[in-house]
Every structure is written in C-alpha cells, then in structure tokens.
C-alpha cells in the first residue's frame, strides 16, 4: 500500500500552514521529514491521519491505497487509523491513558481491528510486548504508565501502533521526550521492527542526523512548502545541491557535531544503545498487587 499526496494545502483560520505539498511514500520505504519548529511538518502528519483541528480547511488530495482521505467521513477514517495507518506521538506520557493498565491499552486495537478475545487476545498482547524487547512483558502489561520508565512507555506506544499490523507508521519526534541515553535504543528498535515487517515509515524530526540514520529518503519542509526531496545519500555527500533551508539545517548539524568533538563528548543520537535492563533506562517499579495480576489482560 502506498501514500500519495498531491497539491495539499491546509489553512487554520487565516494562516496558510501547508502550501502545495506533493509527495509519495512507496510501500515499505522509510521517508524522513525534517524542518524547524513551525515549518508545518507535524501538521502534515495530522492531515494524513484526519486529526486536524476543528475548523481547518483542506484542499488537494491525500490518497491511501486508492482511497481519497480528504473529505472522508470520520467513520471511514476511524476504520483506517490503527489498522492501516498508525501514528506514534512525541510524548508517551500524554499519548497513553494514565488510568489504564498498559496491557489493556494494547488490547484496544487488537479488539477493534482484529476482533481478538480471550486467550488469543492475551497471547497477542504478550507477543506485541515481546516484539519491542520489553523485559518481563507480564509485569509491563499489568502496570500503569507511571510505573514504568519513559523508554519503556515509548516501546509500549510502538507496540500499540503496530498491534493491528498497519502498513504505514507515522512517527512524530518519537524520541524527543526521552533521555538521551535511551534514544538510540528506541530508534534502533523502531527501524528494525518496521523493516522486518515491511512497514512504510514516515519519520518526522527537527534533527538531521537522526533523520538521515532512519530514512531512505529525506524531505525538507520550510514555511509549509517542500524545498527538497532527495535520497539520504545526497544530504551526506552533496549538500551544495540542496536548497538554502536544507543547507542551513545541515550546517547546524555539522556545527553541533564539531562542538561535541571539541569537548570530547558523544552526540546523543550516536551513543551506544542499552540492552533492556542496563544502565540508561530505569525499569520502573513493578506492579505487585494481586488486583494487577487479575486485571492485566481484561
């Protein structure tokens, strides 16, 4: 399944947020979208998901597997979210329900889109948690979000987005809210799992080295417009061929690298990852009540 966007324009009130966006995400490709704050990159992801603010005006086409999403009913969009297109948000602390056990949250898309119940549902929850390399999946399933670490919460969020086997995953700054020592582990996991499954990835960030590490192709957005759409190798090897905005982003990344080099430090996105349970990712306190045991997969 592929995503095709043609001449997409979005207005919020009088503000023209996205201006003539045209792009393709072929089946199985990893595409990075980079831009500064306010460039419109996150608004693009919300437009694809049909989650724009009330009152937004949209013109153009967003075509998913031959289906037009602009103007589609909420019912039709809801049937696509999670089952075919999923989104991983920036901060798992806000994207997860703080009052619901994590196992129950993973169960939601499995029930809704795959119709699983009983033992089949419990097995699917365990598989989803194991796939994202969480230690002691049974404990994680019966825990509330505040009882596990930030890195573990983001892994749970990844498990939720992939639970119903979508064909496209949109990841909007998925590691920004994490401690730098955990970021690489989560990025490696996201890249590995999506490539193994053949899932298309739309990876949104302001950090060029991270985008270049995750993507096959890089799209630069500036002031609501696409200024560059190039293979990732061009960003590394031929920056002089890029637009002024892309060169500015590349220059800032090189300057930051030189600062880290001068002070003898390692850039956060280049730090070695930590295996589950090693220093760098707190495991959180285990949920221990018998009530947790009974309710983990209800």
Regions found by a protein language model. Give the residues of each.
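Hydrophobic anchor residue at the start of the ABC signature
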Residues: 106, 158, 169, 182, ...
